[in-house]
Structure formats: C-alpha cells, structure tokens
Amino acid sequence: MTGSVWAIVPAAGRGTRFGGAVPKQYLHAAGQPLMAYTLAALAAHPAVAGIVVAIAPDDADWPGWTAVHAKPVLTCVGGATRAASVLAGLLALPDGVRADDFVLVHDAARPNLALADLDRLLEIGRGDPVGAILAAPVRDTLKRAGDDGGIDGTEPRERLWRALTPQLFRRHQLIRGLTEASAAGVDVTDEAMAIERLGLRPLLVEGAEDNFKVTTPADLARFEFELANRDRGGASREAERSAMPSAATSVFSGARSAASGSEEV
C-alpha cells in the first residue's frame, strides 16, 4: 500500500529514573537531544509526511523545531498519561488526515529506529485492516516470582513477544480505543492494548533488538556507544541511518542547534 502517513511522538512525560531535572527525551547524546535522533529516524522515511509531538504544557526544553528532513513538525499539549498524549496528537493532526488513514506512534526516547524496520512495518501494517506493531520475540527464560522473591514457576516463551514502537493503526480506531479505555479507567501501556480492547488483532512485525527505549543511564550509555561505533564506521546499519543528525550537521529547521546554539536553516 502506498501513500503518506503522519507520526505522533508522545513527549509530555517526565521520567524520573535518571534523577535529574531534564526529561530523558532531552538528554544529549553526541551533542544532540535523544528526541532529535527519534524524529530524524521517522522523517527520513519517504512515506512519513510529518510529525506531531505532544509536549508538556510547561515544557521549557522543547527546541522549537518546525521541520526535520523538510517534513513539518507540529506540537500539541500532551496529557498526564501516554494515552492522553497520543490522543491529543491524534486530534491535532492536520485537516487532510482522514479518519481511516494509518498513523504511526513512536516513543520519544527510542532513538535507534532503523529505516529497514520502519519500512517493513509500513509495508506489512498498511496491508492489514487493523495495523501492526514492531516487536521482538522473547528469547530469555521467564520466571514467575512469588511474594517472597522466590521462583514460583517458569513461563513458556514460545509465543511471547516484547512490544516495541513504532506502532501503526488507523486514526479512527486508535481514537476510539484510547477514548473507551480512558472512560473505563483502564491505563493502556501501549497503543496496541487499546486496539486489542476493541476486539481487533494487530500484526506483529519483527524488529531489531537494538530498537531499545532509553529509560536508565545504562541505556543512554549504550546508545552513546552505538553512536561512537557508527561514527567510526563500525555499525553494520550505518548506511540506514545516514540521515541522522550529528553535532556538526543538522537536518532540523526552525530551532537553535543543540550543538552550536546557532539558528538552523
């Protein structure tokens, strides 16, 4: 299936695991905020028409980007939860986005998305009536813990997958799923959960294990290590990420450079 899609990035959260005042999506790696890599990875795909970023109402860290790779970047005020921020983003999409159009949702702090994974998700997901998510099969042995910290059992892993992002769904179905979950007091932890509550079955599209979410200092160090290897030409997927920003060059416009403080053009 051809045609363009818009992406939504919920970025109103203020994770506390790092212990600092700066939300994790704005922490720097190689001179750029994590979210710069996230947005650049999305906008690098030719099918992505633009991005809506849901930010906190008092967000003083948002760099004011208006475009990336010449794709428009819009903002809206997010909510107190991820689901509320995604819903706000869905409602803030431009007038030309129709109810049955597919929309991507991607974590702000998941900066290591490969173009090949996004391409495969769009190809498979847009060929399905419901949509699809990137996911990774569980490869570790899973233990069920008891209240005392002991092992109560071993869980079969053969049909278990870890949900990743982006996730791809039709706009009207995701609005309905998130709205109904909120009305029922259900805290959905990803968009697929909201779709599942409607009785729909999204597809699982296997994605790379290194499409990880940065939630701890160790995750940030891992991403910085991968960036360093990429700069030395040692990353196997370097060519896929040639459109990523760096401290010396930016693909953004409408904001000050994270590296130099100069105005982007």
From Swiss-Prot:
EC number(s) stated in the UniProt entry for this protein: 2.7.7.60
Reactions the enzyme catalyzes: 2-C-methyl-D-erythritol 4-phosphate + CTP + H(+) = 4-CDP-2-C-methyl-D-erythritol + diphosphate
Biased composition (Basic and acidic residues): 231-241
InterPro entries found in the cross-reference section: IspD, IspD/TarI, IspD/TarI_cytidylyltransf_bact, ISPD_synthase_CS, Nucleotide-diphossugar_trans
Skewed-composition ranges (Low complexity): 253-265
Site-annotated residues for Positions MEP for the nucleophilic attack: R157, K213
Family label: Belongs to the IspD/TarI cytidylyltransferase family. IspD subfamily.
Summary of the function given for this chain in its UniProt record: Catalyzes the formation of 4-diphosphocytidyl-2-C-methyl-D-erythritol from CTP and 2-C-methyl-D-erythritol 4-phosphate (MEP).
Protein's recorded name: 2-C-methyl-D-erythritol 4-phosphate cytidylyltransferase
Originating species: Xanthomonas campestris pv. campestris (strain ATCC 33913 / DSM 3586 / NCPPB 528 / LMG 568 / P 25)
Lineage per the UniProt record: Bacteria, Pseudomonadati, Pseudomonadota, Gammaproteobacteria, Lysobacterales
Name of the gene: ispD
